[in-house]
Amino acid sequence: MVCYPTFGGSGVVATELGMALARAGHEVHFITYSQPVRLALLEKNIYYHEVDVPEYPLFKHQPYDLALSSKLVDTIKGYKIEVLHVHYAIPHAYAGYMAKMMLKEEGIIIPMITTLHGTDITLVGSHPFYKTAVTFSINKSDIVTAVSENLKDTTFEMFEVDREIEVVPNFIDAAKYAEMQNQPCDRNLMALKEEFIITHVSNFRPVKRIKDVILVFKQILDKHPAVLVMVGEGPDRIKAERLSKELGIYSKVKFLGNSVEIDRVLCMSDLFLLPSDQESFGLAALEAMINKTPVISSNAGGLPEVNIHGLSGYVAEIGDVEKMGQYALDILKDSETLNRFKENARKAALEFDLPKILPLYVSIYEKAYKARKQNSEL
């Protein structure tokens, strides 16, 4: 399992997938430059291999893809790994292909599954400097998956892909959240009894439209007592703090920074705001929904596939903060409506429960391994 070890969606999904596979009895090896943030190393069947990138003054930028491909070769040979699953096209699929070619020289055939997560296609991959390499890496993968129908369509539109892309959506482990819901949510830690708790979780990059989050919250605050809980760090945090001060609502906005206790925040939330310019899937929305938190989102990317309009929340055009504010007020207008949306949000999230999605990946691994055996016998 090759992934980024950070708080980003692709790394979280890869880590959760690997741990679920390990619990199901499969041996899983994580190969990345630092330990993934959600990886539990003490669980059975889980191994972590750090990619060390030596510092050489000759290089202006250290060649991580070269170090990764070499580490892949050594690990695959040393542990007799049978399937390689890379998350995020650049540089992981590219390094994976180079490792495949080096192994092939030694008579070792290993299939590579590449999962596309979003910004590897829409932002990084579309850059002219990377587009050729991304196209090559996708086409040289044995199996390609995307986390939403929208991302699949976007990939075909932006790249000259000559192979099938299977859609395997991101997932949530409902059992884990069921255990948490038996524990009390201390709303008094965040808000007064009469205040609604509105939440946003992201990396605070421009694509997340943090300004829109503040503007939608201002509309809510004009009608109801409320607080806004902002979880995450990124370049637009300072702008968000400045805007909330200009609007006179800074005392009602709580900036928590990066947190490993996101679920504790979501379990006490009444509404989740996600007005992004682009979301290939919307994992943050799904995590809110499983915690019975309805979502107000834009219609960007794969969000409408996750946040069902009128059921788990509402979907509006990108940038239409007035409509988002109206939708938010509609959900918060009375306790009966709010509770209905809360229950429906969880029901919608259960469509992405881990027991439904994990067999899809296992089936893909089996298909790739079977094809590899056939190819090695030719």
Language model: regions and residue ranges:
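N-terminal strand-loop element at the rim of the active site
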Residues: 3-7, 19-66
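Conserved donor-binding/catalytic core segment of Leloir-type glycosyltransferases
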Residues: 145, 191-217, 229
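Carbohydrate-associated surface elements
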Residues: 150, 171
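A short helix/loop element that forms part of the nucleotide-sugar donor recognition site in Leloir-type
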Residues: 178-192
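Nucleotide-activated donor-binding/catalytic signature segment of Leloir-type glycosyltransferases, i.e.
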Residues: 241-257
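Aromatic "clamp/platform" in nucleotide-sugar-dependent glycosyltransferases that forms part
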Residues: 258, 277
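Short hydrophobic beta-strand element within catalytic cores of glycosyltransferases
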Residues: 294-297, 307
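Conserved acidic donor-binding segment of nucleotide-sugar-dependent glycosyltransferases
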Residues: 309-310, 314-321, 330-335, 350
